[in-house]
Amino acid sequence: PDGVEDGHWRHNKGKKDLNRDWGFFTQPETKAVEVELEKFDSTDQLILFLDFHSTFYNRFYIQHESEMSKLPNFTKTWLSRSKELLEDYQFSVDPRLSENNGVSKNYIFTKFKVPAITYEVGDETDRELVKQSSITFAQELMKILLE
């Protein structure tokens, strides 16, 4: 975000964490995305949402199993197939109930009922492993979507 210039790694110049503004849309950056999302209709559908971040560990935040999406087995299938191919890339999966807390994945899931996943890469993860795992995750994702 533009707040990085002032030392605010998670905030924009308005001192707002943009990943806590979804559904509220008080900032110009998230408001612009809301306007684009409103254009989706029955002929131009959103089917999946991935939100990329970095943090301490390789982790995927996903919907809780009690929350059904339009692609009910997508996330579980995608991550399990990928894990089989990624012997050297360790990651955890953290199911969470969707709350109205301004987080993008929760907003998207609640509004569109599509798999909405936060994809976290560890800050200290070897960059070559990140690159190779990203290729695997992308390939497995596309295979499932095309089945």
Which residue ranges define each predicted feature?
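Active-site/substrate-binding loop(s) of hydrolase catalytic cores
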Residues: 1-84, 88-92, 116-118
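Active-site-adjacent mobile loop/cap segments within catalytic or ligand-binding domains
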Residues: 19, 60-63, 68-69, 94-147
